[in-house]
Structures are given as C-alpha cells and as structure tokens.
Amino acid sequence: MSVTDPSTAPDPVRDPVTNRRLDHRLTYALLGLGVFVVLVVYVVWQTYPNYDTYYTLVWGKELANGHLPDYDVFRTPTPHPLSTLVAWVMAPFGTASDRILVLLSLFGLLGFYVVTFVFTERLLGRVIALLAVAVMVTRTDMQLLALRAMFDLPFYLMIFGAALLELRRPRCGWPVLLVLALAGLLRPEAWLLAGVYWLYVAPTTPRPLLIRYALLVAAAPVLWLLADLIVTGEPLYSFTSTREVSGEFGRNRGVGDAIRSIPNFLGGNDRIVTVGIGGLGLLVAVYILRRRALLPLALGGLGLLTFLIIAAGGLSVIPRYLTIPSLLLSLCVAVALGGWRLIAEPTARKVAIGIAIFSALVLAWRAPYYVRDYQKLADQATFIEAQHKGLKGILNAPNAVPALQGCHPITVPTHSAIPIIRYETGLPKEAVEASIGQRRRPTQGVLLIGDTFNFEPSAARATNSNPSTSARKRWSNKVLPGFERLARRKPWTAYGRCP
C-alpha cells in the first residue's frame, strides 16, 4: 500500500491540534517579522515628530517643570489632553524623547495592523484578513503618521480596538466606552461614537449601570473642557483657537465644500483603489455579512457625519477627519479580492468572482503608483532627517550656542521650526520668531537660514487650504545686511548680529 494512500496517511489539515500549532507559529512569525521591520525602519529612516507633536513635547516639559502649558503661541496647534499627558511622562528622557516617541509610534502602527487583521478575521476569515493587511501596507499616508509620531495614529488604533471589543462580545459595555473615552482625549470625534454607543446599549442595560456608562461617555469632553479652563481660563479654548487657525489657513470652507471633498478625501493615497475597488468590496461585504455589517457600516457612517459636523462648526475641512471611513474602504478592497470564497449562491458567486478579477487587474495597473508612493515616502523621510539633524547640529554648534542663548530674536523662515528650537534649547517663546509673523525685518539677533524655505516636506504641510496671499516676507530666509556667518550644518546656516 502506498504511503500516500488517503485511507491510511494522516491528514494534518484535519488535525485541530496541528492546525492550532501552525496558526500560533504563523502568528509569532508574522509578529516577529513586524517587529524586525519596525526596528529596521527606525534605524534606516531617522525621522522626527511633526509640528503638533513637538509643541506637545514642549508643553509636557512645561508641566514637568511645574508650569501650566503655554498655548498662546504663534499658530498654535490644537492641544489634546492625553497627548500632553504622554509628553509629560516623556519629559524625563529630555531631548531623546522625540526619537523615542517615533519608535513607540512605529510599534503603534504595527499594533494597528494587528487590530485590523483580527477585526477583519472575525468578520470575514483569515484569507481576507491577510489581504486586508496587505492593502493597509500600501497606505503610505498611515506610515507617514507613524514616522512623524502623530497622535492621530493611536486614535485610529483605539477606534478600531473599540470596534474589535464590540465585535468579540456584542454590547460589551464599559470596555468599549473606556477605550472611546481615552480616544476622546485625543480627538473629539470619539465623543459622538461614545454617545451613539451608549444609546445602542441603553435598551438592554440596567438603569444603575447605564448611569455609570453615562459617566464614561461624559468623561472625555468634561476633562477636555476642564483642562482648557485650567490652562487658559476658557473652557472652549481648543474649539475657538482651532477655528481661528482654520480660518487663517482657509480650511473652514463649509458643509457644501465638505460634501464635494468627500470622494477625494476618502481616497487616502489612491482614490481609484480605495473608493472605486473599496466601494465594490463594500457591496460584496454587505451581501456576505448582512446584519453583521451593521457595526462597520455604523462606524463609517458616523465618521462621515462627524466630518460634516466639523465642517458646519467652522473647523478644518481636511482629509484626516475622514480617515476612519477611508480605512474601512481599504479593508473592503480585500473583500473585493477575496469575498467570492465566502459566497455559495452560484449567480452571486460569479458576480463576486468578476469583481475579484476586475479588482486584481486594477491593482496590477496601479502597482507602479504604489512603488512611487514608497519612493515619495522615502524622499520625505530623507528630507525630514536632513532638516532636523541639520537644525539640531546648528543649535549645538560651538560658534552659534552663545548667540542663540543671549542674542535674540532667533529668526527662522516659518513657524514650523519654532517648537523644535524650543524643545532642544529650552528657550522661551519670546526668543524665537518666524519671519512670516514679523512686521519688519530684524536688525539684530540670529538668522537661521535653510537651503529651502519650507521646513516640512510637501505632503506633511496642510493640504487643501486657500490662503488669500503668501505669508512669505521679502526678508524671509535671506541673509540680511550686518549679519555674519556663525555656523553651517547642511541644510542650515546661522548668521548673527549681536549688540
């Protein structure tokens, strides 16, 4: 008898114990690979936080020194209570905290991939979950968030984490609300999600427990208002200051413009795939899941509603507020590719196979664009590394340090470099000025001149804004008469004129 005779040969596929062992080995192997990739990226691409995160680190240092954060700065970013608390925890690490935060953010991205994998696997199985992670890896916009240690990334992780908790145990209750409360201390969109979830669990929850749930729902907005009141004396400071900055950059364009922007903003880094193929995958997912599709549909629908509420409130109409629906559409791309495997009805299965073939052809056509996306991401990372290392080098150059400490103002081309200088040197806000905010050209102090006017790579700057005039002044990023060269650290040069 042949050793391959199916009547006698063991079938490891049918052995549940063997299956579990293989699953565990595969899981550990993939996690190990993910950790390895994170460490390689951290070493190869030595990036730094963005403008908002650096100001958060400055505020954390102020808290650690026993002072309230000073939000009254030129073009202040919106303060977020939880991110400021994290910055306070990071303060003992000194000027190493920026790179530590980038490393934590990269691990946060890995955690996000894990959560989206488990979320998709619970709904649609392992094959589609693996496809979903593969699609997510093409989202270079998400990877840029991690490389810049932006606090948007942990927010998305928490939102999908809360959805996963609910998916694993319907009407989960306080664990979901606790995660949403933490997310609500990073971005107010979670307030609406928490409120709607409370209404969802209310019919089946005893009144005493429902009251405790209500306290969790109210926790994030109350703590945010209280933080603003303590720091500024204005409980609505975050809202009013954000609206003012939005108006300054021309981002508050109203509900009409917001609606017209939805298809573009949903697209992430590839509107054809995310909106087009993702839209087809959404139809397949709804057909497969039926009632089980309500949770992701509600999550995406509330994301759209929040975006419109933000627009109606005069706040920024920018892509970040549609990221949750956009990410859900990216998951649907995986359904478009593999959903046919879960459909038994012949006609529907043929349609799903047709969608899968069409989707695969579109992805093959778009493959070169993904290569360009990664090339662009690498260029951005290289630009960020050069800018920050050069600036930090200038700030520590022996010939420049005395002038930087005692010869003010320090003038930089734009506001983008100000929080980095304050973070590195500990100088007060009055010591550093952006040329775009000056009424007249400086006659003394230190000029920090860059090889380029913009401190940030193009994709890291605000998009879709319509400023009426350029903020650049005639003297911006130029050597002025009477200033002498102090030091050069490519791409930065310091010039000084001290009385």
Residue ranges and their predicted role:
Residues 27-32, 178, 214-222, 277-280, ...:
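Signature aromatic-anchored transmembrane alpha helix within multi-pass, membrane-resident enzymes
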Residues 116, 198-202, 267-306:
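Hydrophobic, aromatic-rich transmembrane alpha-helices
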